[in-house]
Amino acid sequence: MTESDSADARLLTPADVRRLAAQLGIRPTKTLGQNFVIDPGTVRRIVRAAQVSPDDVVVEVGPGLGSLTLALLPHVRHVTAVEIDPRLAEALPGTVADHAPAYAHRLRVVTADALRITELPDPQPTALVANLPYNVAVPVVLHLLNLLPSLEHGLVMVQAEVAERLAARPGDRAYGAPSAKIAWYADVRRAGAIGRTVFWPVPNVDSGLVALRRRPAPPTKASREDVFAVVDAAFAQRRKTLRAALSSWAGSAAAAEAALRSAGVDPRSRGETLGIADFARIAEHRP
């Protein structure tokens, strides 16, 4: 994507962001994890990395003042923006009408907490592209992947440490419950690093891009809830062997060992060495 690609969508400059925030009486809050992107080059980069197509319907969580929304609209069929702050949600259509009038019809705004939504209006989203609030990034991604089976792919900007965890593989230092759970839904990879200076206010941490590609869940007789219960138990005491960590889940250490052996997993191993298919097998053998 080049400058000309967004010729009909005038992207927000740092001055635009501060002006809009002042007009709305917005002071970014840590409670909502608000850090607004002020660099047009960064939002172009996100759209490029997201590999969206003209057929994609994008769900964007936390559009804020509209920096990424404006960059997305010329390149996709539709954007459903989910915004928890009523002031920002109310202002976004006007910002799009001013900066990208040719694409204003492609936008729908839903005023809601993304963690609490139970449905979205049609057309159903095929892609998740968002600068996610740091404090809810992992729960939001997992909730939307579970809620919206239509989601085929996505790209999210999150805290660098969260990006590392989401993309970690079994055996990696950062591998944990989020890594295992997201693997139930998608293949995940790091897609780049983002510096602090592209945000206002400047955060205390760096950010990273994470790309997602939907894939089938592991073949298993166990439900997602049952598998995730094993994951949670395994990582609640990650320094312990699985025999010990899963003792409460199974009812006793002996029962945990029996379930692990039935699943073909060494009871002396730790959760950080297992993939999501391993956790699914263990769930199938719960006493």
Curated annotation (Swiss-Prot):
GO molecular function: 16S rRNA (adenine(1518)-N(6)/adenine(1519)-N(6))-dimethyltransferase activity; RNA binding
Annotated GO CC locations: cytosol
InterPro entries, alphabetized: KsgA/Erm, rRNA_Ade_diMease-like_C, rRNA_Ade_Mease_Trfase_CS, rRNA_Ade_methylase_Trfase_N, rRNA_adenine_dimethylase, SAM-dependent_MTases_sf
Pfam family, one: RrnaAD
CDD domains according to UniProt: AdoMet_MTases
Top EC class, one word: transferase
Positions that bind S-adenosyl-L-methionine: N35, V37, G62, E83, D113, N131
EC numbers, comma separated: 2.1.1.182
Sorted UniProt keywords: Cytoplasm, Methyltransferase, RNA-binding, rRNA processing, S-adenosyl-L-methionine, Transferase
Catalysis: reaction(s): adenosine(1518)/adenosine(1519) in 16S rRNA + 4 S-adenosyl-L-methionine = N(6)-dimethyladenosine(1518)/N(6)-dimethyladenosine(1519) in 16S rRNA + 4 S-adenosyl-L-homocysteine + 4 H(+)
Coiled coil feature spans: none
Membrane-spanning parts: none
Compartments it resides in: Cytoplasm
Role description: Specifically dimethylates two adjacent adenosines (A1518 and A1519) in the loop of a conserved hairpin near the 3'-end of 16S rRNA in the 30S particle. May play a critical role in biogenesis of 30S subunits.
Family to which the UniProt record says this protein belongs: Belongs to the class I-like SAM-binding methyltransferase superfamily. rRNA adenine N(6)-methyltransferase family. RsmA subfamily.
NCBIfam families: ksgA (TIGR00755)
Protein name: Ribosomal RNA small subunit methyltransferase A
Originating organism: Thermobifida fusca (strain YX)
